[in-house]
Structure formats: C-alpha cells, structure tokens
Design a protein with these regions (language model features):
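Histidine/acidic-rich helix-loop-helix segments that form or flank divalent-metal centers
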Residues: 54-60, 104-136
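Divalent-cation-assisted or electrostatically stabilized phosphate/pyrophosphate-binding catalytic cores
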Residues: 81-101, 127-128
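Membrane-helix exit/interface motif
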Residues: 43-47, 71-80, 106-115
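Active-site alpha-helical segments that house and flank conserved acidic catalytic motifs
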Residues: 37-43, 57-76, 131
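Short, solvent-exposed segments of well-ordered alpha helices
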Residues: 2, 22-29, 123-127
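Amphipathic alpha-helix face/heptad-repeat signature
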Residues: 4, 28-31, 59, 91, ...
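Alpha-helical phosphate/pyrophosphate-handling elements in metalloenzyme active cores
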Residues: 23-57
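Short alpha-helical hairpin
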Residues: 1-19
Length: 136
C-alpha cells in the first residue's frame, strides 16, 4: 500500500516551534502554504521588475514540500538545527533518509516526479527564492 498522501496529511498536526514560546501557533501545513505564497510572489516580482525568467509555479511546489521530512521527525527549531555544522549535517542526513522513505511510499513512476520537489536541486534560482521565502 502507498501511504505518501496519508503521511503528508500529518503536516497539519505538526506544530512549528513547539519547543519555543510563540504568540501565534502555526502548523507545518500553514507554514508550507505561507512559504509557497511568498516564494511565488518573489518569483513574480523578479520576473516582472527585474527581467527574470524563473518558474514561479516550481517555487510554489518546492515550498509545499520543503519540510516534508518533518511529518516523521517533527519540527526541530532553527536555532538548534543550525547550532553547529555537525548538528546541521546530522540533521540533514536524517531528513534525507526520511525523504527517501517518503518517496518509497509512492509508486515508482510517481516517486520520480515528486523527487524533484522533495530532493530538489539546491543550485536553482527557484530553490534559492523558496529558501528566502522560508526565512520571511
């Protein structure tokens, strides 16, 4: 049985910054939607005002899937995740293993398509704009 969509449905159950005090609660699904909206806007601004030629739909799709590993790992607050290069590297390895398992929960022909968003090429302008949006 393929469980990819059931696993992604958990995004609405994963609280972000759960270990930190926050005035507004946000779940992983809300965060992904926010990053998609801001990222796509950044791409449209770049294309409209700065002569860019970025795929704004790809930015939005990258944003929707950028934290999918957290449906298994939960949210690790940014100050911890980036505390040291060693911790960042270890956490990246954990996320990669989880993302591999998520892709295995799809039929192979579909996993190939989703891999573009779950294990993206981090050198593209679309990915870089999505990461900027993730920090807003």
């Amino acid at each position: 049985m393929y469980t990819f969509y059931a696993l992604l449905n958990r995004m609405k159950l994963i609280a972000r910054w759960s270990l930190m005090r926050s005035t507004t609660k946000e779940d992983l699904m809300q965060h992904a939607a926010h990053v998609a909206i801001v990222g796509q806007a950044l791409g449209i601004i770049r294309n409209t005002y700065f002569g860019g030629n970025v795929d704004t739909d790809k930015i939005a799709a990258l944003a929707l899937y950028h934290d999918t590993a957290e449906v298994v790992s939960g949210d690790l607050p940014t100050p911890i995740k980036y505390y040291s290069p060693r911790i960042k590297s270890a956490y990246s390895e954990i996320e990669d293993v989880i993302n591999g398992k998520l892709l295995e929960s799809l039929p192979p022909e579909m996993a190939e398509k989703y891999a573009e968003y779950i294990r993206p090429d981090t050198d593209t302008i679309e990915y870089k704009l999505m990461k900027v949006a993730d920090k807003v």
